[in-house]
Structure formats: C-alpha cells, structure tokens
Curated annotation (Swiss-Prot):
It is an enzyme of class 2 (transferase). Homodimer. The gene is hisC. It comes from the Bacteria. Its EC number is 2.6.1.9. The modification N6-(pyridoxal phosphate)lysine is found at K215. GO terms for biological process: L-histidine biosynthetic process. Keywords: Amino-acid biosynthesis, Aminotransferase, Histidine biosynthesis, Pyridoxal phosphate, Transferase. It comes from Buchnera aphidicola subsp. Diuraphis noxia. Its cofactor is pyridoxal 5'-phosphate. Pathway: Amino-acid biosynthesis; L-histidine biosynthesis; L-histidine from 5-phospho-alpha-D-ribose 1-diphosphate: step 7/9. This is Histidinol-phosphate aminotransferase. InterPro entries: Aminotrans_II_pyridoxalP_BS, Aminotransferase_I/II_large, HisP_aminotrans, PyrdxlP-dep_Trfase, PyrdxlP-dep_Trfase_major, PyrdxlP-dep_Trfase_small.
Length: 363
C-alpha cells in the first residue's frame, strides 16, 4: 500500500536527488566542524520580545529598514526570506513555467540552484566556469540563453572561493537585459565587500542579489536572508511568499545584529577569519599531500590533495569534518575546508601533517 501512495508524488520529485547539506551528511559527528562554511564562533544576541501569541509580520518593517540602511537601498527593494535558499526558490516559482522555461547555473557551484529547478520541473542548463580560473564562460552562456528566465551566479563562489570578473557580470547583464534575470548570490560578500553588485541595481533592472546573515554575521541558526532587486520584482515575490515566513524571534535577533555596534563586531570577525585563512594556506603549502590550493576570498578554501579520499576519511575519524568535493565537475581530489578558529585550524594541520609523513614520506 505504501508504494502506491509514494507513486502519488510528482515523477520529478520521486527521481530527485536531494541537496546533501552539511548536517544531512555529517549530522552531529565530530567536534571540529569545518564543512558548512559557518562562523566558528557564536554571537551574543538574545530574543527580547515576549509576546509570541500573535502571528509575525510577513515582512518586518523594522528589519527591512535596518537592512536597507546597511546596504544603502530603499526599503521597497528588499524582501526578507528564510535564508538565501528561500530567495532561490521564490525566484523559480515566480518566474519559471514548469516544463517550458529554464535556468542556467555555472558549476562547480552551490547545488541548490539545480535542486530547486528539479523540484519545480524546470529545465536546468549547466554552463561550467572555465577550469582553474573559475571565470564565467560567457560565450557558452550566450549560446544557451534560449528559454532561460534565470541565471544564477554565486559570487564569491561556493565551493571554489573565487570571484567573478565584474566586467563579465556587466557583459552578462547587458546580454540578458530584456530576456533574463541575473541572480547574483552574495552569501559570502562580507568577506570581500568591494565586489558587491548592490550599486548597480538601479542601472540593471534585470539584476537580483541574494544575501544572508548565515555566514559573516554568524547567524546560520536563525535562517534569515534577503532578496535585493527593483521594487517591481520584489512586489512579484511578495505575491507568493509564505504569509508568515520570518518568526518573531528571528526578526528580533536579526534586527539586533544590524545595529552599528554588531556590524563592527562582524567586520572584526571577518578580519580575524581572513587572517586565519592566510595562516591556514601558508601551513598547507608546506605539506606534501597538498597538490594545489585555490585562491579564496571567503571563509573557506578549496584544496586538491594526493589521497584526498583517505585524508577525508582520516579527518572524519579524528572528529574533524570537512566537505568532500571530489564528485563535482573539475574538482577531482578536492576538499573544501571552512576556516575555523586558530585552534581548530592548528588541529587540522597537525593531523594532515602526521598523515602525510606516515603515508607520503612528506613533512
């Protein structure tokens, strides 16, 4: 009987390979979590409101105003969402016709663009970035624009840590000005703020930006993100968003995090993580099992190893959880390592050094 009921699910959902989140893969295993690009330290914010018997505002005005000040945009250009992930989904639901329209995404990159397209039976076109430089392949994007409504660009990119050329982004926006929305996912932009595209929202009506409080703001646990776009696009998304997407505790904590004092603390954490990243890269360069370290502008690094599977498993057994990227296009033998505290990074280095000395006759 249960098999008959399962067949009631949409065919594309039955076939769907779900997104493998860090928690879904790793659960609570280990004590050093370097697999989800989270902040290694928590922030001291608290939920102050006590009245929880009323439904929350669909779009909390105070929170939108605070974020508008932070990004220097108008309040009517901002939508609050349950993390940037909801923004990815809303755009597909609002703009793509099932079985007719398509999206483009550029692997190796964040998988939720593809997963959401599959959920809603939207065709997805993969246009890989140029190997090793990870820049956009504009020629192949142009050749694949037929029926494409949305183009997702993660910048800085997860998992490579690279940034797109701004000229390429401008060229892409010009190329698709009247035909497609270019969605720039800026989840990690606080680590390289000068690369943000917010200044160009007025010039390019087809530009949409996704933001989150999960990374530099160290608030992954509250699930709060934002869509930044022209007010007309925000109005469309407001038509289909859940009636009460942002809980009262989430809105309260998010609002507090946008106070100027907490923004300064966030910026200081970014400086610390950037320094830890440089330290970690310099230490990894001296280890014989490391084949290549890709340049990163974020709170994680992509490293190609000799014996990557064995190193991944060894770290797992030692309670150090990193993200295996070997299955992704052009990322053979690559592991993605979140930059942790100095103590966590030191422990990681010691374990890899010990492994290398034992099995590769290296340092």
């Amino acid at each position: 009987m249960i098999n008959s009921l399962i067949k009631l699910a949409r065919i594309n959902v039955q076939k769907l390979q779900p997104y493998q989140s860090a928690r879904r893969i790793g659960g609570q295993h280990g004590d050093v979590w370097l697999n989800a690009n989270e902040s290694p330290v928590s922030v001291e914010l608290s939920f102050k409101k006590k009245l929880l018997n009323r439904y929350p505002e669909c779009q909390p005005i105070d929170l939108i105003s605070a974020y508008a000040d932070y990004v220097r945009l108008s309040t009517n250009q901002i939508l609050v969402t349950r993390g940037a992930d909801e923004g990815i989904e809303l755009l597909i639901r609002a703009f793509c016709e099932s079985g007719k329209d398509a999206i483009i995404y550029c692997p190796p990159t964040y998988d939720m663009y593809r997963v959401n397209a599959e959920i809603y039976n939207i065709k997805y076109k993969e246009v890989p970035t140029i190997k090793n430089t990870w820049q956009l392949d504009l020629l192949n994007i142009k050749l694949n624009l037929n029926s494409v409504k949305l183009i997702y660009i993660c910048n800085p990119n997860n998992p490579t840590g690279s940034t797109c050329s701004k000229k390429d982004l401008f060229d892409l926006l010009e190329m698709t000005l009247n035909t497609s929305l270019v969605v720039v996912d800026e989840a990690y932009i606080e680590f390289l703020p000068k690369e943000s595209m917010t200044l160009y929202l007025k010039k390019y009506p087809n530009l949409v930006i996704l933001r989150t409080l999960s990374k530099a703001f160290a608030l992954a646990g509250i699930r709060c993100g934002f869509v930044l776009a022209q007010k007309e696009i925000i109005n469309i998304l407001n038509k289909i968003i859940s009636p009460y997407p942002i809980s009262i505790p989430t809105a309260s904590i998010a609002l507090e995090s946008l106070h100027k004092n907490y923004i300064k603390l966030m910026q200081n954490r970014v400086l610390d993580l950037n320094a830890n990243r440089v330290w970690l890269i310099n230490k990894l360069k001296k280890i014989s099992s490391v084949k290549k370290i890709f340049q990163s502008n974020t709170n994680y690094i992509l490293v190609q190893f000799f014996m990557s599977e064995e190193i991944f498993q060894m770290l797992w057994e030692k309670g150090i959880i990193v993200r295996n990227q070997d299955h992704k296009i052009n990322l053979k033998q690559c592991l993605r390592i979140t930059v942790g505290t100095h103590l966590e990074c030191s422990r990681l280095i010691e374990e890899i050094k010990f492994f290398s000395k034992k099995y590769l006759k290296g340092v």
